[in-house]
Each structure stands twice: as structure tokens, then as C-alpha cells.
């Protein structure tokens, strides 16, 4: 009996290994001080940290959730990599020249080296974004049509075959459509004028196939196009029927789509409906929840719903206990008795840094007033020294804190903080005035804070008068 069990166990191990539902990923990173590489996929159902030794070497077995496009991140630099079960892929790169130095060897190297070369070709053809997009529409169309042909010729000259080649051909097509879509956006960004577009300009995007699961797991441009298709078609549908809700629109749009992960992407775009700005968010929540299939997304929208419920105006804000730049720790309870204006930021967040001069001015404007300005950084442990360096460099003022677990800290999760910068206003009792306050640079921020302070003064005087009586 024992021999039979051992034989069955050996058979199971052999069977499991022979399927090779994993990728071996190894290599060397020159000139890096980082001790780990982060690997993940676009669905966010695979995330792993791979250790990098003191010589820059790494090696790990990755039990991937599906073939497709993944990303590897070292420090702040990251790039795409294609994984498929059975790949034995070796990567070498120089952290000082991250993108240009990438080279792959081993099984799976052909498609990944092709991708590196195609990315370099794209950078060369596009060049300066302003010069590329700010041209008459006729010239732009001629340019992207020509570039598409160049990319297709480049693919034909490669060694790729079969499905791998077809996947890359579709990537070229989707990249072309996304570039076409972005013309208006980039042109307007640089000129502040929306260019006149020919009739039917967006038709190829509106009429695109929304049920291509292979493209979905391999191609970020395809995912972005699904989002843009959603925006274009929802706008059109609501112009025809103003009574149509976003939730009803999505429910109708996904009914003929077979891919559950594509359906989930479309439904997840409704998460913004779970907001105090939407008076129907309580009834929208169960309708959105029932359309989702992924447990991860169900948990995410439920957490957001609970967060909105718990962070409504006049609700007590959750406490925090964060490191203070000046030493020790600061809790929200320590700030009780003052209005608290919280600005959530990070050293790597460009828009956050752009808000700093305005925040500095606010702190000066309200010096001596009953308000505390608190900047909370969500930087990771790896960026601790950057935070310590940037605080005195920018010299914003106020109270400078560092969240213990970044966006995963309880305070951040309670407020469903996803995008930064984010501003929050609390009253003297630590209760929420607004979970989304105007940014420091907004035109109405100063007058809004003034009105809150004046309200407090009037309330205090009224209480004092009552006590005397």
C-alpha cells in the first residue's frame, strides 16, 4: 500500500511539473542598489517581489495566473515583459540606462527582444509629443498611417510566427487606434483649442471588437481603447436618452460580451458612482456588485462603499499615529481643538509637488489662526530617505508626517485614497467636514477655510454668551 501511495505521489509531482504552469525568470541588474524587483500583471491578480542579491543577480519561479503582458519594476523604473507558461527567460540590464540596455536570452526571448526593439523604434518615430500631435489633422493621419506600415514591416522582418506574431500585429493595430484617439486630447493640451475632426473620426474605436480576451491580457493599448470606447458610446447613448443611468448603460453594454475579465473592467469603471456626489450611490452599489465576477473587485467596491458610509460629513475621522518629520509620532487626537487641513502626497507625485507653493502660501495666510496644516506622505520604506530630504528642500511648513503603510494604512483605506494629491478637512472635534476638500491651488480654498474659521468664531462667541447667561 505504501508503495502505491508513493507511486501516486510521484506521478502527481511529475504530472504537475510536466505541465510547466510557471515561468523561470532570472538575470542580472547592473548598477542597482535595490534589493528586490516587483513583478505584476495588468489584472493585478499576480504580484510578487523577487530578491536581487548584492551582485545584482535574481532568479525565481513564477506561477503566473495567465499568459500575457506583465511588468517588472526596479526602483521607480518599470517596463513590460511577456510571459507564457514554460518560458525560461533571462534578463540583463543596466539600471543607469534602464530602457536601452534591456536584453533577453532563453525561451521567450524572441518576442521580448522584439518588443524592446519596437519600443525603441516607436520612440524614434514619435519623438517630441508636441511636434507629433500639434499638426493639421490631415498631416497627422498621413504620419500615423505611415508609422503603422513601418511597424508592420518591422514585424514581418522579425522571427515571430503563429499566435505570437498575430498578437503583436493586433498590438500594432490597437496602438494605431489609441494614437488616433489621443490626437484631440494632446492637441488641446498644448494649444488649449479642440481641433476640428472629420465626420466619423472615432468610428473605428466605437465599432471595435470588445470581446478579444487574448488582446486584453497582452495589450495595454487594447484595454485603454475599451475605456475610451466606453466613454464615447456612453456619451452618445445619454445624449439620445437623458434618463439613462451609467449603471443601466453598462449592464446593457456587457450583455453580449463573453469574457468575464473584460466585463469586469467595464463594470469597474462604475466604481466612481460610489460617491457622495451621486445621490443614488446606495442603490447603485448592489447593482454594480451583482455584475462583477472577480472576488478581488467585489471586495474593492464593498470597501469603497463602506468607506463612503464611514467618511460622510460629521462622521468622526479614523485616528492615525504617524512618524513626524521633527521627531516622534503624531496622532489625529493630538490635533484636536483645531481645524485640520490634510494634504496627502508622495515624493514621486508630480501633481503633488506642483501644489506645494500654494500650500506654503495657505500656511502663511493662516499663520496664528486656529487651523493645522498636515502633509501626510504615502512614500514606501524604500523612499524614506527621499522623504527626509524633500521635506526641508521644499520647506512647505505645517506638520509633516509619513504614513506607516502608505495607501494600505487604515486611515488611507478608510478614505478610499487612490489618486493623489488628495485634500481632507476635519473640524475641531476630529469630525469630517469634507472627505474631498478643494486643493491648495483651487481659487476657492482660502475663502472656504476663512468661512469655516469664521463659523467657529461665531459658534465660540455664542457658547460663551450662553454660559454667561
Language-model features: locations:
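Bacterial Sec-dependent N-terminal signal peptides
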Residues: 1-27, 452-456, 460-463, 467-469
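A non-transmembrane, solvent-exposed segment enriched in polar/low-complexity residues
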Residues: 17-167, 171, 178-196
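Short, internal strand/loop/helix patches
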Residues: 323, 388-424, 428-429
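Conserved redox-active cysteine motifs that mediate thiol-disulfide chemistry
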Residues: 336, 344-361, 375
